[in-house]
Amino acid sequence: MYKAIIIEDEALARQRLMYLLEAHHNNAISIIGESDTGKAGIDMANQTRPDVIFLDVHLPDMYGFDVLKALDIQPMIIFTTAYSDYAVQAFDVFSIDYLVKAF
């Protein structure tokens, strides 16, 4: 089972993503934490050491790309964004995929 955290400032987007992951992946992913800011997300990720991070590109205190650079670990990163034009930039910083928010 993969351990995952969600770093997303929009509560509804966090809830929808958690529902999708928990309801449709037959216990393959366990959500072990969630955060609504980049700083708190960095601290959580470095403490819990997840396998996967679902990371919003635009957070209230920093960009998701800066969160990625500040991590002490190298988990799989899946960026979430409302703008598909961030996809190329996401792949440039070694994310494995991205989700356009509409989930």
Roles of regions detected by a PLM:
Residues 26-27, 39, 46:
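Detector for Asparagine
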Residues 42-103:
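CheY-like receiver
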Residues 11, 36-42:
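Acidic phosphotransfer microenvironment of two-component signaling modules
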Residues 11-33:
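Two-component/phosphorelay signaling modules centered on CheY-like receiver
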Residues 1-3:
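Non-catalytic signal-transmission and effector/linker regions of two-component phosphorelay proteins
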